[in-house]
Amino acid sequence: MAVKNPFGFTTGPVTFWLIVVYAAFLIPLVWIHESVPAVPSSSKNPYPQLNVTEAWHDLTHITRKYHPYNSRANDEVGAYFMKRIEEILVRNKVEYTKEKDAGGVIWPQEAYDAPAPAKRDVQRRDSKGPAVTIFDDTISNTTYLGTSGSFNQAGAYGTYFEGTNKLVYIRGTLDEDGEWWNGKRDPRKIGQGGVLVNAHYDSVSSGYGATDDGMGCVSILQILNHYTSPGHQPMRGIVLLLNNGEEDGLYGAKVYHYSPLYYFTTSFVNLEGAGAGGRAILFRTTDLEVTKGYEGAPHPFGSVVAADGFKLGAIRSETDYKVWTESYGQRGLDIAFYRPRARYHTNQDDTRHASQESLWHMLSNSLAAVDNLQHTTGYFSGSRNDGDKKKVASGSGTDGVWFDMFGTGFAILELRGLFAWTLTLLIVSPLVLALVTYILSRKDKYYFFSRKVTADEDDEPVSVGGWKGFFRFPFALVLSASITVLSAFLIRRVNPHIIYSSPYAVWAMTLSLFFLVFWTIAKGASVVRPSALQRGYAHIWLFVISWVILVAVTAAADRFKIASGYPFAFFHSAVFVSALISLCDLFALPSKQEFARNAHNDQQTRDNISEVPNSDALISSRHSHVEDDVAEEPTETTPLRSGENGNGNNGTIRTTFATTYRRSLSAIMRTPDEEENKETEQQPYDHEQQWSANLPSWTWFFQLLLLAPITITVFLQIALFIVSAIHSAAADGNDPILVYAAIAAFSIIILLPATPFIHRASFYLPLFLLLVFFVTLIYNLVAFPFSAENRLKVRFQQTLDLDANTSVISITGLEKYTRKMIAELPSGAGQPVNCTPGYGLTSDCRYNGAAVMPNLPQFTHALPANVSKGRYANLVTVNISRSDSSSKLEFGIDAAESKVCNLAFDTPVSFNVRGSAGIDPIFSRPTEQGVRMLTLWRRDASIPWVVDVEPIKTKAVPAGVLAKSSDSDAGAVHEDLRVRKSAELSGTIACQWSDANVLGTIPAFDEALQFSPDWIAVTKASVGLVEGRKKFRA
């Protein structure tokens, strides 16, 4: 009994290997995506100086309270970090100093040209001086102008911010001696430049900040412990920055411009949290050389797709990375948590919902990046390509492509390398296939696109069936892809937000549906018109499609520096080799002439048989075998006369001949020796073309191994990242149609490797997928889209009219669900709710908040709602006085226990905040008619702002003359341009309160957390949870 080929192109092996190969890659990739590597034991820890237990303890301490910049808890967290920094240095017995004047440096607006970088092979002695210097910034401030701000106001605006950053300088062996930052105000290159490691220690007012950005902060403490341990002094100096004020406008990074270390740091690693756990992804990098620093990460995770998403504007969330690169010109990496977004900026961004594994992932990967950067000299110093002298002299980098493989390997190549690869494929792959096609044609073995062939000129043409199966693949692909996309759009229309909590249910539906529809069409066509060329034609179509896509990928890489098309380079490479195998299969076939000749001979034999006078003529004329033949036993149908056929047919061959003698044409023509080998001869599969019997039946397996693994790996990793990053974007007002379209598209791409072989799959596989499809379809259509683990985010703010002593509560979110939430709140039940369109799909729903008036810090106990109108009279004070000039006004502004106020003027003004460093030349943009909005931040809530304000009216006012300038002639220019105006100045002041740590301070927020459904998450709508507004007039 013959053993079946386990790799044969038949139903059993094809079904088995399709399941095995897809399961072998889909399951691990999903597992890697959903899990986080375990913290290694002490014996296996690649960085023994990193103490995850200690870091976790620090994290639990700083996340006990909400700690936004505008809160008392924020000051406590800053003090805790200063205490921990000194404890680590004392423990490691490190010589350190503390700088009192840690900021306020005003740099020239144009830097000097940086000297050429030092030669890498030059030996120099170790830098001398204190090993560590601590900078506690309590004096820096920045003032800048623009056209949009943290309050999303329209028109020109001004911002004044006071910094409270904490910096630690770790001396490198290549750094200059001593305290080189003292007494130097020229921005020349210091040594080989330094590495900046940044994280922000403020949280949002509605979240504890465990991953945003507590893990980044405690990672910095452990990095400090690593580099201050004996034997670990870095080569290039390292600056550890714990900045404050990131959440409401990247202010902490912006005020770093006034640090004495500003021009020293030329490369950076930014640690951020845009999610609430999981793995920390390499979000983006500036160039190839910097990315190589991440190459040694123990568990690399990320690809260039995220960076291109920022570049194209598809991802709008910004981090301090934007300041370091766009404003300062540094080169570095952005490492951040990005999922689950449903917990981001909510009270579930805490240690209960985080893990030590996530902390270890960020900590170990970031230290690996920092370590590689501090060892790298010569790349991150020198003149810039853009020639911008306001920016750091960080040299220039190369565009790159990068991606991880299974969370363990990391691949990097130059973008021009990708361009060369794709361009080579575009040229070489069709030429190679054309060459093989030419050789096959010369050998007369190119069966594709061949209808008929003749052996000789006088013979009738023989059908080859070379066109059978040509149109099946595009028809099946278009129809199955269309139905798959339509199913995703159906879910979007009926239950659009199910993707929020159940993305894998949508994945299962689209994957099963595409396979099911494609199998039905391909299998049906194969049954009706069997063709041995169906697999080959599928490869030809795949080659054409991937080649066309690769043209776009190549153009994007060359013209727009977009590297995200790299998966299609892999895909086309695999398709090219697989298509080449399909062509090479034809070399095993007889030539078409030979096939036609054999077919013609067989036909002649059939004709001769049909013309014989009686059955005796059927006896072979080969006399050497006649004697061996044994006469058949007579039966009832045996003729009475030997010369007569049964049934009185008079020698005519009828259809009953085959039934009577059961002897085929091949049996008649075979010798007994040939008859013995009959069972071993290859036969065409299931009525396919006769010539296909000689096609290799095992090459399909190698084609599957070429196509499936690489396609699944590169595309599924990207698909899982994209869907995880945007599947909950509906809470931000974005239409989820993009998520559904992405899932449908990636489902099609992931299953494309199976399409050339799908018609040989067993009926039971699509039958099972049919069940999967119906179950997931019903679930996706009827299930409630949110859950306690995947909460819908709504945005909260309470607005006080301090003049009228009234309150309005605003809940912003998806209107259908926001109304359900408000109906369950004690203060909102039964009240009229007015909803107006907000951003995207969201609505701003408002109701009267008189029942839950805030008990702001000056009140020690709750007051009844019907108190006198002066309840909040002294909450915000604005004292306005005129100076000697008839148009110049002095504003004295204070707000009880608030660090931020916003002034909205009815007419454009120029302004100067007392004690400011002047207009920042980096962040300011020229304004045409002054500013109408002014945002003021202060580090000490007990010190009022004093602002000089003057109404102006001019056609064009340069940015530098709207406020105090460090240039001596700025005042004269200002006098020349302004138009004095003695009329009254009016407007509105709005101050913010963000501290909800004491229960009862903001009762409306407390009840939103307590009484909302468990599928609702409450986050901040603006800087403050409470905004108090009042009018002013001078």
Curated annotation (Swiss-Prot):
EC number: 3.4.-.-
Keywords: Glycoprotein, Hydrolase, Membrane, Metal-binding, Metalloprotease, Protease, Transmembrane, Transmembrane helix, Vacuole, Zinc
Source species, domain of life: Eukaryota
Active site per the UniProt annotation: E246 (proton acceptor)
An example Gene Ontology biological process: proteolysis
Intracellular or extracellular location(s): Vacuole membrane
Residues annotated as glycosylated: N51, N141, N805, N866, N879
Protein name: Vacuolar membrane protease
